[in-house]
Amino acid sequence: MSTNFTFDKKNLNLAEDIIKKYPPHGKRSAILPLLDLAQRQNGGWLPVPAIEYVANMLEMPYMRAYEVATFYSMFNLKRVGKYHIQVCTTTPCWLHGSDDIMKICEKKLGIKLKETTEDQKFTLSEIECLGACVNAPVVQINDDYYEDLTEEKMEKLIDEYSNDFKN
């Protein structure tokens, strides 16, 4: 398979170090960290060439890598905004107001679920349990978790991210 994606020098070195942590016959086990690395290098999403590249690097069929990428919600197969807002909508968060948090996000950002703002700054998604049920409702924005959210706290967060934390 030919690809249009390659790791940059820094990430190639990191990928090689990750692969070395696994026995030679088990290097396919490095699929999760390598897909994550590819996604981070590519601005938060995994195009087909990146999945192909990782599969080739791990000497595994593309379809196996694709199955992993589509199974885990942490991988995005479509472009996402600079800030990916993921609202947990499972039962504990829903009981504590995740629907209201979602509505605030939609209203404040002017988009619906699974959409990205025109300026490519925000993407709004729902996500399955983030494992912080005791502090529901929970939202993940990129790599950061925000717990015990209220509508007011969510509005403030969106304002801070809108301004790239400059104020």
Curated annotation (Swiss-Prot):
Cofactor(s), by name: [2Fe-2S] cluster
Catalytic activity field: a quinone + NADH + 5 H(+)(in) = a quinol + NAD(+) + 4 H(+)(out)
Gene3D superfamilies: Glutaredoxin, NADH-quinone oxidoreductase subunit E
A single MF term (Gene Ontology): quinone binding
Matching CDD domains: TRX_Fd_NuoE
Catalytic activity, EC: 7.1.1.-
Pfam families noted in UniProt: 2Fe-2S_thioredx (PF01257)
Free-text comment on the cofactor: Binds 1 [2Fe-2S] cluster.
UniProt: [2Fe-2S] cluster binding residues: 88, 93, 129, 133
Enzyme class label: translocase
Alphabetized UniProt keyword annotations: 2Fe-2S, Iron, Iron-sulfur, Metal-binding, NAD, Quinone, Translocase
Role: NDH-1 shuttles electrons from NADH, via FMN and iron-sulfur (Fe-S) centers, to quinones in the respiratory chain. Couples the redox reaction to proton translocation (for every two electrons transferred, four hydrogen ions are translocated across the cytoplasmic membrane), and thus conserves the redox energy in a proton gradient.
PANTHER family: NADH DEHYDROGENASE [UBIQUINONE] FLAVOPROTEIN 2, MITOCHONDRIAL, NADH DEHYDROGENASE UBIQUINONE FLAVOPROTEIN 2, MITOCHONDRIAL
Record family assignment: Belongs to the complex I 24 kDa subunit family.
Stated name of the protein: NADH-quinone oxidoreductase subunit E
Organism: Rickettsia felis (strain ATCC VR-1525 / URRWXCal2)
